[in-house]
Amino acid sequence: MDSKEVSEVPRREVRSFLMARDPSIDRRFRPRPNKKMRLFDNIQESEEESFSEYSDTESEYKYQSSEATEGASCATSAADSSNVETGPQVFLRLRPVKDASKAYIVSEEANVLITSCKVDSTSNNVNRMEKHFGFTSIFDSTVGQRDIYDTCVGPKIMEEECVTIMTYGTSGSGKTYTLLGDDVRAGIIPRALENIFTIYQDTVFRSPKLKLINGSIVFLQDDASLKELQIRKKLLDLCPDISAHHQRLKQVIDGDHMFETKASTDVSVLVWVSFVEIYNELVYDLLAIPPKQDKLGEVPRKNLKIVGNKGHVFIKGLTSVFVTSSEEALRLLRLGQQRSTYASTSVNANSSRSHCVFTVDILKYNRSGITTQSSYKFCDLAGSERVNNTGTSGLRLKEAKNINTSLMVLGRCLDAASTVQKKKNADIIPYRDSKLTMLLQAALLGKEKLAMIVTVTPLDKYYEENLNVLNFASIAKNIIFKEPVIKQHRVSYCGFMEFSKMSTCEGGDYTKELEDENVRLQLEIEQLKYDHVLQMQLLEEKLRRELTATYQEIIQNNKKQYEDECEKKLLIAQRESEFMLSSQRRRYEEQIEDLKDEIEELKNPASDTDISDDPNESKSPIEILDDD
């Protein structure tokens, strides 16, 4: 009887060291603190809330809406604007599928995803439990690219703050589509480029006078500016022609958004773009100018080095290209896409095998001499994969290992960042363990804004992979950073314009100085116009002389050739006429000789004595007719 009762008691799952769990990037099996600390006293908890041992955000976001979170952050900002603490925004996007699984349910507030697997799509009993994952916002399959941009990216560009935007998810879940879109539905990168150049339409400077070099803004001399323009021209010549495609995208974007132009005459804006790829923990420049090679074959790519200097992280030797329009930036983006590494797997026919980071740096120069920098990083992270499901081997297996390793390090960094605010002796964020985290350490350390767009395919066969992705996102949602400081630099000299310094004397008339400066600049403009006209006239006269000399030389050559041809034809005609005359003369002489012989025969006397044998022959005398 006792043995029967013991057998009916369910056994607790015992973790085995012989058959370990599948390694992944999630942190759901790490130990949890038993003691909980109440952060907000004003939030009323429901009596129905139940905390789970294995859920990261099961009840923390179940009854809390996004409006309450925003209200708390606004109150904190009003209390102390210098020490504002905010966390990264984490968005969830569900890919449209034909038969969506019922294991994924979105709450009415559209900020909590409830997962509960009721089929045999997972081998772990813990994964079958109902879990609640909180997000800043959740986009279902009906939400388009316009709403995603307006929610995730548009406000940050209008606020002119540095931001890193990452797309994370499994292979084939729509990460690249969210960033780039297609020919009809533009992604967030084309929309962001169009938004940036519309905002600064009247202030975009046409010459590369400032550049971000090794994390610092540097003034470029004329020869350096000319070199940057040559690099820009070479790369644009290599880019595909997308004029018609850009016009279609522009029409779509203009129809979806009403971007406004900022009117500012005191600021000059320069835009630089760069594109980098992290493949097998090696950093490659996707906008590098290909070297000239004598032999045929693939050109080996150069591995770049990530360097940190005084808190600034940069890639040594990375090509940064100066652009003046959204079309130029989009052409460079397409060029980098063609050079990035793609391969086919059993999950995705065109799977990205590397992490790609497209950066847009905006440098603004104020007439007071202060420059500000705004950087927008768009990171297309490679999809996390399970080797058993993808069936990779060889090179694909090596790529999958490196991808999962870098994503695991990213998860460790996010986990460490989330515990920094909770513990006094927190672990150091291990951003040096991966090239990806080294490049994104500014966002991981809270120096820049961080936004993550998590993409999920709501199907039962991807349930375990989606749980790993959701657990990864829940770690990022718990991070709290202080408000980043806007980067400002001061330059001693600028080539945009020479501003007159304000008089240090008391009572100095600054308006009078500006008027004098305006008059001086107008006179300088007139002088430049006069010099330009004079140079054009001299150049025109020089060209006229060169053209006249060239045409005269051509005419003389043609005349000489014509005279030579006429001489040859005349000589040939003369020879032909002489030959005809000589032949005709010989013929006439022969005829004359023949006639003379006949005359001699007729005048011969012996011919008179010849008597005809015919008696009837007439005996009339022969008459000799003279030609005369």
Swiss-Prot record:
From which domain of life does this come? Answer: Eukaryota
Q: Which GO terms describe its cellular component?
A: cytoplasm; kinesin complex; meiotic spindle midzone; microtubule; microtubule associated complex; nucleus; spindle midzone; spindle pole
Q: Where is the Kinesin motor domain?
A: 87-479
Does the record bear Cytoplasm in its keywords? Answer: yes
Disruption phenotype annotation: Mutant female meiotic spindles can be unipolar, multipolar or frayed with no defined poles.
> Which SMART domains does the entry mention?
KISc (SM00129)
InterPro entries, alphabetically? Answer: Kinesin-like_fam, Kinesin_motor_CS, Kinesin_motor_dom, Kinesin_motor_dom_sf, P-loop_NTPase
Task: Describe its function.
Answer: Required during female meiosis for bipolar spindle formation in the absence of the centrosomes and chromosome homolog segregation. Also has roles in male meiosis and mitotic divisions of the early embryo.
Q: What is this protein called?
A: Kinesin-like protein subito
The organism encoding this protein is Drosophila melanogaster
Which gene underlies this protein? sub
